[in-house]
């Protein structure tokens, strides 16, 4: 293994290049800082990333470096959120599962990919570890590969491997992965989790996200049997279910006996569980999020969250009004794939009201809010006040159902808005 310094490695980046930085908790921070240190020598470098969870704000995303770097994110996480909402960086709306197509088709050409990889095995293969998602296709489409070799990166199996002969420069950078603390569900989240868990049958295949409500759902599944996992992000919450044999993947049609994800984020406990574990398969996001793959599994239960839902079932999950908070991610991919699965169900979960007392069920979405899941795709909506099924319901019927799970303090106001919008059609709904 021939190693060079980070400063030497990033000299392969030229002005005008397009650079992809591996995301999730796999950000190669040694390489990112070395690239940023070359700002005075570089101009017009496009820097792409997605769901990059760093220890601090991205160092290249600063107003004073705008002539050197143009930061672009497909899904906003903590290290670019401030820069994007200040206009220093930009977000590209895209379904996560379709971004590899943008790379492979040349619509977004890439010159350089920066990776954070495991040490090579005896055959010279390094693992991308906890993040194959976009990295797999980015490597495939880039002219130059620069890798930070990290003894803390777990070795995972599936798509995320690269031979040292394919890497143009390798740098030693032993950094523990960023840990994402497990969110302990509060009482509201537990009530929502219980409503959703009651709809999940034995033998279901789970897609479940990150946060208090997903963890509450997982906590409520400990009496279930023969569950499977085919998800975008694998977190700590699924590990106890796997270890107890509740998630055994025995009834899945694709990768039976193995859990499937495209990225993993959580505590060191999760990373230790993944290291060398062939019971977990990490795949390219173009594969994990393909609805035609998702639908092959039985009883797909897609559990996702939202920022607000309007009375017709339009779901905003990426922004708070005009302020970008996250991105589309794989919500659409799994809502669609889950709907096509035999016995599948798709859930959107959210508290009925914010901590500031603002209703999350609204007459119309806030000005500037993005529609991540359309009202044509909406199925189950759950709050702490219940769960309702919107599919095949008229707009007036949907409004009636959604008002029934809104916070009691706003139901009268929502009813007035519904009458004004739907008129006699709303009044006729039983």
Task: Spell out what each predicted region is.
Residues 1-430:
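Conserved alpha/beta enzyme-core scaffold
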């Amino acid at each position: 293994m021939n190693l060079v310094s980070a400063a030497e490695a990033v000299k392969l980046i030229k002005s005008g290049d397009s650079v992809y930085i591996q995301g999730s908790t796999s950000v190669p921070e040694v390489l990112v800082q070395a690239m940023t240190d070359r700002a005075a020598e570089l101009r017009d470098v496009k820097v792409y990333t997605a769901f990059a969870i760093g220890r601090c704000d991205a160092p290249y995303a600063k107003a004073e470096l705008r002539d050197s770097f143009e930061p672009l994110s497909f899904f906003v996480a903590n290290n670019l959120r401030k820069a994007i909402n200040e206009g220093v960086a930009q977000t590209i709306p895209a379904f996560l599962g379709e971004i590899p197509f943008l790379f492979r088709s040349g619509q977004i050409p890439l010159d350089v990919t920066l990776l954070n990889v495991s040490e090579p095995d005896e055959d010279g293969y390094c693992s991308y570890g906890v993040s194959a998602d976009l990295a797999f296709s980015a490597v495939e489409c880039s002219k130059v590969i620069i890798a930070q070799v990290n003894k803390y990166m777990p070795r995972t199996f599936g798509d995320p491997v690269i031979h040292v002969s394919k890497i143009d420069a390798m740098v030693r950078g032993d950094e523990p992965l960023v840990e994402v603390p497990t969110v302990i569900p509060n009482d509201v989240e537990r009530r929502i989790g219980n409503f959703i868990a009651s709809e999940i049958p034995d033998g279901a295949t789970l897609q479940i996200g990150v946060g208090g409500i997903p963890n509450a759902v997982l906590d409520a599944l400990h009496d279930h049997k023969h569950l499977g996992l085919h998800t975008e992000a694998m977190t700590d919450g699924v590990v106890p279910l796997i270890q107890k044999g509740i998630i055994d993947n025995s009834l899945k049609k694709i990768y039976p006996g193995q859990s499937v994800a495209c990225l993993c984020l959580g505590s060191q406990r999760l990373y230790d569980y993944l290291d060398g574990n062939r019971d977990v398969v990490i795949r390219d996001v173009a594969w994990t999020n393909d609805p035609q793959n998702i639908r092959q599994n039985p009883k797909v239960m897609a559990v996702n969250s939202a920022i607000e839902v309007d009375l017709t079932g339009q779901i905003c999950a990426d922004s708070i009004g005009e302020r970008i908070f996250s991105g589309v991610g794989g919500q659409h991919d799994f809502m669609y794939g889950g709907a096509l699965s035999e016995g599948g169900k798709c859930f959107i979960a959210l508290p009925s009201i914010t901590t500031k007392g603002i209703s999350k069920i609204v007459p119309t979405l806030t000005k500037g809010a993005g529609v991540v899941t359309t009202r044509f795709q909406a199925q189950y909506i759950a709050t702490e006040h219940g769960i309702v099924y919107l599919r095949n319901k008229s707009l007036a019927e949907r409004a009636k159902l959604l008002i029934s799970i809104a916070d009691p303090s706003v139901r009268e106001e929502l009813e007035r808005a519904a009458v004004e919008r739907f008129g006699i059609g709303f009044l006729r709904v039983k």
